[in-house]
Amino acid sequence: MPRLSIVVFCFHDTPLLEETLVSVLQNRPDDSEVLVMHDGSYEDPYDLGDEVRFIEASAVQSMTQAANLAMQSSRGLIVHFLAGGVVPDASWSDVALKHFDEENTVAVVPLLLHEKDASVACLGVRQTGLHNRALVGFGREHLEVKSLESDGPNLVAAFYRKSQLMSLGGFQEDLGDEYSDLDAGLRLQEVGDVVTAADCVLRVGRCDKPRRVSAVSRGRLHHRFLTRRRESMGALRYHVSTWLNSILEILTAPRSPSRLLSAWSRLTAWRKQDEMAEMAAEDGAIFSIDSARHQDESRESDGAVDETSRRAA
C-alpha cells in the first residue's frame, strides 16, 4: 500500500493535464501512486500506463464528484488532489508528508502561487464573518502569508488523510466545488488538525475546472452551506447571514447584475427551505460516500424485514 496517492483532474484541457503530469512524474516522491481522473477524452499518447492509473469519469459533473470517486479507487493513506494546470515545485510533497507524521493531522494546506508574478493565488480557504468562502492570502506577496491560517485546503491543490475524510462521508457533492472543500475543512477541524504549510509550494497559471457556476446556483449553494452549518451557527446568525448576504448582493448589483440573481436564488431557497435538502431527507439522495453507504444499508435492512414478514405469513 503506497503512502501517498496523487490525483490529477482533467475535465476539458489536455495540455493543462500534461503540464501537471510532467511535473508530478519528474518530482514523484517514493512510495506513491499517480491517478488521473479524466472525462474520457484522454488517450494516453505517451504510453504512461505503467506509471499512471487512468480512470475514466465521463459522467462526473464536478471536481467534488471526481474527488470522491478517486478516493474509492486510490490505495494511499494520504490523498493529494491537483487540478490540471497546477504545477508542483520539486520536493513539494515532502513538506506536507512530514506534517502527517503527527497522528492528529487530518489535512495540509499548501501554498498556491500565480505562475506569472509569484503573487499568492491562495493559501487554502476560510469562512468569512458572513459565512462565505474566501481564498486566503489572494493577491499578497509570498512572504506576507506565512502567519495566515486557513479553515481547509482549496480542492485544486489539497492534502487529506483519506481515512478521516472518508469517515466523515467524503465531500458533500450537493455543495458543489464552491463550498465542498470549505465544508470538508470545517468538519475535519472537529476531529483533528488542519495544518497550513506555506513552505509547500505549487504554481498555477490557468486551472482546468469542469464548468462555470451560474449566479442562481451560486446563491442556492451558499444557502445550502449555511443550512448545513446552522446548528453550529445558531438560528439567529443563520438568518442574519442570509439577509446580510442578500442585501450586500443587491447593493453591489449595479457593478455586477448577476448578483441580483444570486440574491434571488438565496432568498428563494431560504423561503422554501431548500428543495435539494428536503429531497435528500425524504428520498435518501446520494450526495456523499457516507450517504451512499447508509442508503445501501437501509435497503438491505428493508429487504431483510420484508423477507422475514413473508416467511411469517
Regions found by a protein language model. Give the residues of each.
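Glycine-rich, basic loop-to-helix element that forms the pyrophosphate-binding segment
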Residues: 57-74
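Short aromatic/hydrophobic "clamp" motif used to bind/position activated sugar donors
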Residues: 79
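Conserved donor NDP-sugar-binding/catalytic core segment of glycosyltransferases
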Residues: 86-87, 91-127
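A short, conserved alpha-helix in the catalytic core of glycosyltransferases
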Residues: 96, 150-169, 174-201
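N-proximal low-complexity "stem/linker" segments adjacent to membrane-targeting elements
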Residues: 1-23
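Non-catalytic, C-terminal membrane-associated alpha-helical segments of glycosyltransferases
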Residues: 214-220, 231-313
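Short, flexible, basic/aromatic active-site loop/helix in glycosyltransferases
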Residues: 127-150
